[in-house]
Structures are given as C-alpha cells and as structure tokens.
C-alpha cells in the first residue's frame, strides 16, 4: 500500500477508521520552523466530524498529539510524529459489511487486491485517513509561511449537486468561507446547498460537488518537469483524496473550446516582476509556477454509503441486498475544504524544498 507522499517533505499516514488511532510521520521538515499542537488542532477542528448538522454525527475530538520532532514550539529537523486517538467508533454498525460489498465503495477492490480488509468504518479507505494529511498540511504551511509570509491557500465549496456558487477567485477570503457550515463564500448559495444536503440525508441519499482552491503568493519557479510538473503533482495530491473524481487547473476542459489567441496569457512587466494580463494557465506554465494565482477545481462524487436498499454481492459471489448503517456524511464537500488546502500546502512545500536544493530562491 502506498501511504506516503512527497520527495523531500515526505509524509506517511497510518491507522484505520475504527482502530486505536490515526496519524502521520513527517520526514524532511527543516529545523527551527515554529509549530505547535494548537496550529495543528486549528486545522483538524475544521475537518473533524460532528461540527454541524450537515456532516456525520460521529463525535470525535480529534485531539492532536505531537510525539516527536518538535521541542519548545520549534521543529528539530528530525521526523515529526503526530497521533490522534479514535474514540467514538461503533463497529457493530458495520457487521453486515464484513461480507457484503457496498456499491461504489472500496470494499470489493480492497478484497480483490489484498484478500483482507479492515471492514469496520472502511479502514484505510475511510476519510479518517485524511487526519494525518491535514495535520501534516499545518506543518507544511508553517514551513512555507516562514519563507513566503504572504502565501495563502484558500479553498471553498463551489457546487453541491445542482447548486452553484458565484464566487470571485481573486476576492474570496477565508473568513467569508468559514462564515457558514457548508464553507462557501456565496451566502445565498450556502442556504440552498445546506437545504439540498439535508434533503438528501433525510431520504438516505447523498450528493457530490466541486471544491475550488486558489493559491496566492506562490513564487515563480516551483515545479519539476517533466514527470513531476507542479500541476501534475497537484493533480496527484488532489485525486488521492477520498471521493475525488476530477481535477482541473486554470481553464481546464474549457481550454478545448478556445483558440490559442483566446487562451494565451500575454506577459507584461510590473516593476521588476513578470505578470500576465489573463490567467487561463492557472498560475502554471510548462509545469512550473509563474507567480500568478494557482487556480484549481476538484470534483467529488456523492458519498458511496447510502441508507437505501441497493443491489450488491457478498464475498462468496452471492447476490445480496444492502442498506447502509452507521454514521456517514450525506455530502463530503464541507469537510473536504481543509483537506484540499492541506494537500496544496504539502505539494507546494515539497516543491519549494526541492527547488531550494537545486537553486537558492
């Protein structure tokens, strides 16, 4: 199983949904970076379950404990281990799923690959695996903010099912996004999104949608062609998040409908800085950041576990019917926002440290 991400700033997540706990080991973090448990906890609180009435009611404090690699609020340059205990797991709700496969979940494919799986709560396929990513993302953020104080990563829910928000990439703020439980910066769309999620939940169904993410203040020069282009590794990072099905940077698929003259971003000088008049490239050209805002869209499928009777099969190849039990998100989008941000920070931090190894910034 590949549970690691990054080359220089490298993370390895561990743990299962209903095991003793989950966490992450970070290797390659520079020394003397200010990091506290409070910094990590702030991000974990944004992704934890039970935070509102439109997410899973599972009650977990998700308290982060730094086990190694940090002393007196500063990183030591040695591996950083962060642990979070699982407390509110009810494995009995998954007894039937030990033999019967949930449609479109990872139950069957894990069995096909490993011949065994941690069936309670989905094991490693559970979104609780992302706790380690979010914790590590907080550390990556600290590394980058030390080098580039103005850099920021802001993600928000742009669409839930058929409800779309109207949000300006350039003006969106973290405070506006956190002002509502669905995490969008469009108040009118937020109300409609919340209503749609509740309606799906009450009927036992689920909804998907789109998260948008903008990176501001990224320096030019990050990215490692040809196989580790910045947009390629961002795609890798985002598509590794549970339930993701699509990724686009800049104009994305809309580029197919444009001419070269329409899509090209003309250059101009702003003092000593090279700028572009448009940003169809989404801040990345030739796989390398150009200093403009990096614009991303990530598509999420509806949650696979439904409280509706569905056709399936069991481990013995017999036809079966299955109705989900347990506690699940009817829509993962509100809690996916901090996960998307964390993966962006991790990707950018790794590329920054790679670049620092090659050339002084």
Swiss-Prot record:
Listed name of the protein: Chorismate synthase
Keyword terms of this UniProt record: Amino-acid biosynthesis, Aromatic amino acid biosynthesis, FAD, Flavoprotein, FMN, Lyase, NADP
Pathway: Metabolic intermediate biosynthesis; chorismate biosynthesis; chorismate from D-erythrose 4-phosphate and phosphoenolpyruvate: step 7/7
NCBIfam families: aroC (TIGR00033), PRK05382.1 (NF003793)
Binding site residues for NADP(+): 47
Function: This reaction introduces a second double bond into the aromatic ring system.
UniProt xrefs under InterPro entries: Chorismate_synth, Chorismate_synth_AroC_sf, Chorismate_synthase_CS
UniProt cofactor note: Reduced FMN (FMNH(2)).
Enzyme Commission (EC) number: 4.2.3.5
Molecular function terms from GO: chorismate synthase activity; FMN binding
Gene Ontology cellular component annotations, sorted alphabetically: cytosol
Assembly description: Homotetramer.
Residue positions binding FMN: 124-126, 286, 301-305, 327
Annotated family: Belongs to the chorismate synthase family.
Top-rank taxon: Bacteria
SUPFAM superfamilies: Chorismate synthase, AroC
GO biological process terms on file: amino acid biosynthetic process; aromatic amino acid family biosynthetic process; chorismate biosynthetic process
Catalytic activity: 5-O-(1-carboxyvinyl)-3-phosphoshikimate = chorismate + phosphate
Cofactor(s), names only, from the UniProt record: FMNH2
């Amino acid at each position: 199983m590949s549970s690691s991400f990054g080359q220089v700033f490298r993370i390895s997540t561990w743990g299962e949904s209903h095991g003793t706990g989950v966490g992450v080991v970070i290797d390659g973090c520079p020394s003397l970076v200010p990091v506290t448990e409070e910094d990590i906890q702030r991000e974990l609180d944004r992704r934890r379950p039970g935070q509102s009435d439109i997410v899973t009611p599972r009650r977990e404090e998700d308290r982060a404990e730094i086990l190694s690699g940090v002393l007196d609020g500063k990183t030591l340059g040695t591996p950083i281990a962060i642990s979070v205990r699982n407390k509110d797991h009810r494995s009995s709700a998954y007894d039937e799923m030990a033999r019967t496969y949930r449609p479109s979940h990872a139950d069957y494919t894990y069995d096909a690959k490993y011949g065994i799986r941690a069936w309670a709560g989905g094991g490693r396929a559970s979104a609780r695996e992302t706790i380690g990513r979010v914790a590590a993302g907080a550390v990556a953020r600290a590394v980058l903010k030390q080098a580039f104080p103005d850099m920021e990563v802001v993600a928000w829910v742009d669409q839930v099912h058929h409800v779309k928000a109207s949000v300006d990439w350039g003006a969106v703020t973290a405070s506006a996004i956190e002002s509502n439980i669905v995490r969008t910066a469009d108040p009118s769309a937020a109300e409609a999104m919340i209503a749609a999620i509740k309606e799906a939940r009450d009927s036992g169904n689920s909804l998907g949608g789109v998260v948008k993410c903008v990176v501001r203040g990224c320096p030019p020069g990050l990215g490692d062609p040809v196989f580790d282009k910045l947009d390629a590794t961002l795609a890798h990072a985002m598509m590794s998040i549970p339930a993701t099905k699509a990724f686009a940077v800049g104009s994305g698929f809309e580029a197919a409908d444009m001419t070269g003259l329409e899509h090209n971003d003309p250059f101009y000088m702003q003092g000593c800085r090279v700028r572009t008049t448009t940003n169809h490239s989404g801040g990345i050209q030739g796989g390398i950041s150009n200093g403009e805002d990096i614009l991303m869209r990530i598509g999420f499928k509806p949650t696979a576990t439904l409280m509706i009777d569905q056709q399936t099969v069991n481990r013995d190849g017999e036809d079966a019917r299955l109705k989900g039990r347990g506690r699940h998100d009817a829509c993962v989008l509100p809690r996916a926002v901090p996960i998307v941000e964390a993966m962006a920070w991790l990707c950018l931090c790794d590329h920054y440290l790679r670049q620092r190894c090659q050339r002084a910034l």
